[in-house]
């Protein structure tokens, strides 16, 4: 499962490629067809991450993606390849250099359009993300210090510290 640092990099890369531009959103597989129709043609404001969650803001609506164990993005410039397999979602836009840019999402655990209160409910159940600016580690410290659980298990608990996984636990 991709860990927090990977999601932060994805958020940065997607923001650089797509933010401030209308995005053509499709769901070749069909599982995200309603969400794709809602977002298609809208301008992407920004992409952020919190822990292992990715949030793409399109005005009042937010696309939430959690890659889970099997999810992945591929990206490129120019004309995207023909859709194949279980392609959940594709973004296409004119990139900052005038060339076409695209990204494909496959195998994600979550790919859904949420309102601000729904995003808040996700964030409320997570601990601090140490890679975010102004992250407050006192919450994690309090949860760790007050627990009798082994530190390795606590580090894997996303309500204690968001974004940490087996790579950092090891």
Tell where the protein language model's regions lie, with residue ranges.
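Structured catalytic/nucleic-acid-binding cores of DNA maintenance enzymes
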Residues: 1-170
């Amino acid at each position: 499962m991709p860990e927090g640092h990977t999601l932060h990099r994805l958020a940065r890369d997607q923001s650089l490629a797509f933010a401030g531009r209308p995005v053509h959103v499709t769901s070749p597989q069909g599982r995200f067809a309603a969400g794709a129709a809602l977002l298609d043609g809208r301008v992407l404001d920004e992409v952020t991450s919190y822990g292992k969650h990715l949030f793409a803001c399109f005005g009042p609506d937010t696309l939430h993606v959690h890659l889970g164990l099997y999810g992945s993005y591929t990206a490129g410039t120019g004309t995207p390849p023909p859709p194949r397999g279980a392609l959940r979602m594709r973004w296409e836009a004119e990139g900052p250099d005038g060339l076409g840019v695209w990204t494909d999402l496959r195998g994600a655990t979550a790919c859904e359009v949420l309102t601000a209160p729904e995003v808040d409910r996700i964030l409320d159940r997570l601990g601090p993300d140490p890679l975010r600016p102004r992250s407050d580690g006192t919450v994690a410290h309090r949860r760790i210090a007050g627990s009798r659980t082994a530190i390795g298990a606590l580090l894997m608990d996303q309500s204690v510290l968001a974004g940490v996984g087996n790579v950092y636990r090891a």
